[in-house]
Amino acid sequence: MTVLFLCRQNAGRSQMAQAFFERLAPEHVALSGGSAPSDRVHPTVVQAMKEVGIDLTGRTPRRVDRAMLDRADHVISMGCDDPAVCEYPGRKVEDWALEDPSKKAPEEVRRIRDEIRARVEALVSRLRAGQPERAGADRPPRPSRS
C-alpha cells in the first residue's frame, strides 16, 4: 500500500505524517508533496520531530506531481488548498484539516505533531485491519474538469 500525504508547502504537516508513517508501517510506502513547496522543512518542525527521535534534517520539500498521485493507493490532504492537486478527479481524498505549523510557536508545533502522530497511528491500524478508508471522513470524488 502506498499512502500520499499532501499539504501546501510540504514543509510541515505532510513531512511529519510521512515520517511517522515510515516509522510505524515500514511494510508500506509513504510519499509526501505540496502544491507550493517551500525551500526547506520548517525549523520548528525539524526540532519537534527530533524531540520524538525522528530526524528530518535531510528532507527536502517537493512538489506533488501526477506520478505521485497515480502511484498512491490512499491520498490524505492536510488543509491543502489547491483543487488541482487535492481534489484528484475520480479519487477519494481523506482530509485531515490540520493547522499549518509554519508560523507557530514550538508548543503549538508539538501539539500539531502529536495530533498527526495519533492520526497516523489510527491510519496504520485501519490499514492493518484491511480498512484503509474511514467512513464519513473522505470527500467524494470530484468530477473531471474539462
Regions found by a protein language model. Give the residues of each.
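Phosphate-binding/catalytic loops
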Residues: P83-S146
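Mid-chain, well-packed structural core segment of small domains
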Residues: R59-L98
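Surface-exposed beta-strand edges and their flanking turn/coil or helix-capping segments
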Residues: Q18, P43-V46, R71, G90, ...
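A short acidic, often aromatic-flanked loop/helix-cap motif at beta-alpha or helix-coil junctions
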Residues: S38-R40, L69, D100-K104
